[in-house]
Amino acid sequence: MFGHLFVRDSEIILIDPPLVPGLVESITRMGKPKAIILTAQNHIRGSKYIREKTGATVYVPDQDQRAVEPQDAQAVKEVDQFEKYSTGTGNLLGFEVFKDFYDFALLTDHKELIIADNAKGSADGELLLYPESVPHDPVHPANETIRREFKELVKKTGAVTLLAGHGYNIYGNLQDLADRL
């Protein structure tokens, strides 16, 4: 599992931050965390702790509740203070918000697509979509709807890089890999 950190005008924005020892101290050496954005409600990870230590605002996606496990919904409630966002939110702290199946995707101004769980790179540079991205024997391929929707998302956003929540990132050739789906 990964998180991402963006520094914008000396303000720090965390995307799906993990809960690891020393993270808050390391981040605050660079600046004051302004926000924590979750791409899926099950990515709550270190959000509550980081918010309590830094005062950063937590943004939680307004997900379809059929895609949210009860324990994840409870963990979000325990964050206590958060803002909900959706595709109608518009620009969220410099990120464009898009729907990605039941989760949300964020697009940076450098055409980097930040995805929760539905896509990732493999060690050999291939693009994997859920559920093929989860180790199974035999491999469970992604269905055609998932492939088509992801391909359309990449094309619509113009994204060239995938910043994945799990697995490997894909740098520079996301359009080409999505075209091959």
Write out the residue ranges for each language-model feature:
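A short, polar/charged loop/turn motif at coil->beta-strand junctions and beta-hairpin connectors
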Residues: 9, 86-89
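Zn-dependent metallo-beta-lactamase
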Residues: 1-10, 54, 156, 175-176
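Residue-level detector of beta-strand structural context in well-folded domains
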Residues: 2-4, 83, 103-104
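Metallo-beta-lactamase
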Residues: 12-14, 91, 96-180
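Active-site-flanking structural segment that lines cofactor/substrate pockets
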Residues: 1-7, 12-26
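Residue-level signal for well-ordered alpha-helical segments
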Residues: 4, 24-27, 33, 130, ...
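Short glycine/proline-enriched coil/turn segments at helix->beta-strand junctions
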Residues: 9-10, 30-33, 52-56, 108-112, ...
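Active-site HxH/HxHxD metal-binding segment of metal-dependent hydrolases
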Residues: 19-87
